[in-house]
């Protein structure tokens, strides 16, 4: 196989790996935790993974001391937890 063909194959495999969703067996355990507002009194939009709906949802975060199922962006939540 030529070097161009190998590069194309490598590129396709990399793309496939990036687009393959997280399976439930590979999902971190903290993705199962309920949303946690934290102990501070702020009003920041954050996202958490909801396992019963199998998707990331917004919630209001107080700004500190929450559990790890707390993401600044929807994309970060999906990349980490969504299948």
Curated annotation (Swiss-Prot):
This is Kunitz-type serine protease inhibitor vestiginin-1. Expressed by the venom gland. Serine protease inhibitor. Keywords: Disulfide bond, Protease inhibitor, Secreted, Serine protease inhibitor, Signal. Residues 1-24 form the signal peptide. Residues 31-81 form the BPTI/Kunitz inhibitor domain. PROSITE patterns: BPTI_KUNITZ_1, BPTI_KUNITZ_2. Disulfide bonds join 31-81, 40-64, 56-77. GO terms for cellular component: extracellular space. It comes from the Eukaryota. It is found in: Secreted. Belongs to the venom Kunitz-type family. Gene3D superfamilies: Pancreatic trypsin inhibitor Kunitz domain (4.10.410.10). The record marks 41-42 as: Reactive bond for chymotrypsin. The keyword ATP-binding does not apply. One of its GO terms (molecular function) is serine-type endopeptidase inhibitor activity. SUPFAM superfamilies: BPTI-like (SSF57362). PANTHER family: BPTI_KUNITZ INHIBITOR DOMAIN-CONTAINING PROTEIN (PTHR10083:SF374), KUNITZ-TYPE PROTEASE INHIBITOR-RELATED (PTHR10083). CDD domains: Kunitz_textilinin-like. InterPro entries: Kunitz_BPTI, Kunitz_BPTI_sf, Prtase_inh_Kunz-CS, TFPI/VKTCI-like.
